[in-house]
Swiss-Prot record:
Entry's EC annotation: 3.6.4.13
Name of this chain's protein: DEAD-box ATP-dependent RNA helicase 22
Notes on the domains: The Q motif is unique to and characteristic of the DEAD box family of RNA helicases and controls ATP binding and hydrolysis.
Organism expressing this protein natively: Oryza sativa subsp. japonica
Region of interest (Disordered), ranges: 288-317
Length: 577
């Protein structure tokens, strides 16, 4: 369904028979000015999400209590007897969580926090909206609070020196980095200061002048910093040594496409530092990167020059290539202790978090993690890759003549009072398309019938996207977007998701529908599809009814397509011969 062709269609004829939708009331003028005008004294970043999140949590707790409050079935929260303190969280941090509107851990948080509090590597694969971000932030902050700063220069403001305890969180894009920073800084003490400070290094943001406890970065930005002019590698060495906890948020994206080589390379560097530290402790001698000839500086420096565009690119510009984890950064001409010694004393913890983590095949993200971290603890959500029972599904087959009216009817349906819980604030509807052109076309259609909407796609500037996303969070309305808004972004209380064009793959489908029914709430997903998608939709619905992974439906479609292609090729070959 190529919606961008609608720009050249006689819209007036199609829309003449449709009732004009009443526009949403505009926000108060004072509030609008506050959103659009640059502030000289911006409010603390944690206040942006505190109110919507508190509303969402309260509503979910009420629903959970009405269902028995035992955490069973389709409940979001853990059992009533499970508290933050019972998971190993200190009273101080538990108080900060209560202050942020998080009175009780979710099922996923209750499952993963005790494991992350240990020294084990952990892989958290759980459905969207299950509380994964706080699932790793809470134990990281707990560890950082409990660790005493023993280094002599612990009061230094240089991010590469001082405390030997830094948590590193890697995210695929700028918006997700800033979101994680907001969520970390929302956990404050009695004075209103964050328990542990977090800062982002991504996009236009340079390296922080004041050392944070939690550094959130895109792989490209981090590599560019580590490989700046540093002849003795001291900056890189100090940073790698100080990082004790590493989180890979949206791990499935970070381990494929344009991010794969960058992330694997960072893992090599961190593991190499672990081996150096292990050898130093065994020998009792100081060993640095500058003392190891096997660490190949030149090739690393050349491949470290990455553009800022890489942070926003998800289309796989860097080709896949096999990587030997154990032998990274080792000269091919030497076989020293690092090449033959596979057992070494661990000094870092790795945590991988994802809402979609396919494991079928060695090249999938799940397959890569199984090989690289065979001893990691896996924590899986109850509805990973499966239908969320809190979702109301609506499936509508459309043609070129009915797709516009079906889209407008879907938008109208989500605006009904009986569909949207007004206690959760303004109505929020997300309309997904497959391309930027289609998003622009849908926006034009909605504007022509009097429905204000906000655009969010990759052709918009980073500043425009940030402003539009904040407006959507604060004021609600209709957000017309591509899959750039499908992953990672936490917008509380989205009541309705509309697929104006059906998703092309299982990952996109799961992330789209995961924008609603988050944090224990209910939600609606309306999927418009054409005859070309009919078999795929039938397979998806069957998988949901049988509580099977949705990804298999898309795999069957791909296998069927490949089979048809092979048959067509054989026929062409036979005709030519």
């Amino acid at each position: 369904m190529a919606l961008h062709h609608l720009r050249h269609a006689p819209l007036a004829l199609r829309l003449a028979r449709l009732p004009r939708l009443a526009p949403s009331p505009p926000p108060p003028a004072a509030r609008l000015l506050l959103l659009l005008a640059p502030s000289q004294h911006p409010a603390p970043p944690w206040r942006l999400l505190s109110r919507p999140r508190a509303l969402a949590t309260a509503a979910a707790e009420a629903d959970d209590a009405g269902a028995g409050g035992n955490g069973d079935g389709d409940g979001f929260f853990s059992e009533e007897s499970t508290s933050w303190e019972s998971l190993g969280v200190s009273d101080r941090l538990a108080s900060a969580l209560h202050g942020a509107g998080l009175a009780r851990p979710s099922l996923v948080q209750a499952a993963c926090i005790p494991h992350v509090l240990t020294t084990n590597d952990v892989i958290v694969a759980a459905e969207t909206g299950s509380g994964k971000t706080h699932g790793y932030l809470v134990p990281l902050i707990e560890k950082l609070c409990s660790k005493s700063i023993s280094a002599e220069d612990g009061n230094s403001q240089d991010v590469t020196s001082g405390s030997p305890n830094i948590a590193l969180v890697l995210c695929p894009n700028v918006m997700l980095c800033e979101q994680v920073v907001r969520m970390a800084n929302s956990l404050v003490d009695e004075s209103g200061e964050p328990l542990k400070s977090a800062a982002a290094v991504c996009g236009p943001k340079g390296w922080p002048t004041v050392r944070p406890d939690i550094l959130v970065a895109t792989p490209a930005a981090l590599l560019n910093y580590l490989f700046d002019y540093d002849p003795e590698k001291r900056r890189r060495e100090r940073f790698l040594r100080n990082v004790k906890f590493i989180v890979f948020d949206e791990a499935d994206m970070l381990l494929c496409g344009s991010f794969e080589n960058q992330v694997i390379r960072l893992i090599h560097m961190l593991r190499f530092d672990e081996k150096l530290l292990s050898r130093m402790e065994d020998s009792g001698k100081e060993i640095s990167l500058g003392d190891t000839n096997e660490y190949r500086e030149d090739s690393d420096s050349q491949s470290a020059e990455l553009s800022a565009d890489d942070e926003e690119n998800e289309d796989g510009l860097v080709q896949h290539r096999p990587v030997n984890v154990e032998n990274a950064h080792i000269g091919a001409h030497k076989k020293d202790w690092r090449r033959v010694r596979k057992v070494y004393r661990r000094s870092k913890q790795y945590v991988f978090v994802a809402a979609t983590l396919p494991q079928s095949g060695k090249k999938t993200a799940g397959g890569v993690l199984k090989r690289m971290f065979p001893n990691a603890v896996w924590v899986s959500g109850a509805y990973l890759h499966r239908h969320n029972p809190r979702l109301e599904r609506r499936w509508i087959e459309v043609t070129a003549d009915t797709q516009v009216s079906a889209l407008l009817d879907a938008v109208k349906y989500g605006l009904k009072n009986e569909v949207h819980d007004t206690k959760l604030g303004p109505n929020r509807t997300m309309v997904f398309t497959n391309t930027v052109d289609a998003a622009n076309s849908v926006s034009d259609i909605l504007q022509r019938v009097g429905v204000p909407c906000i655009l969010y796609h990759r052709d918009s500037s980073l500043e425009e996207r940030a402003k539009n996303l904040q407006s959507f969070r604060e004021n609600g309305g209709v957000l017309v977007c591509t899959d750039a808004a499908a992953r990672g972004l936490d917008v509380p209380n989205v009541s309705h998701v509309i697929q104006a064009e059906f998703a092309a793959c299982a990952v996109d489908f799961l992330h789209r529908v995961g924008r609603t029914a988050r944090a224990g709430q209910s939600g609606i997903v309306t999927s418009l599809y054409t005859e070309a998608n009919r078999d795929l939709v039938r397979a998806v619905r069957q998988a949901e009814e049988l509580a099977q992974p949705v990804e298999k439906a898309f795999s069957r479609k791909r296998s069927f397509r490949n089979k048809l292609k092979k048959q067509a090729l054989h026929k062409s070959t036979a005709l030519l011969s």
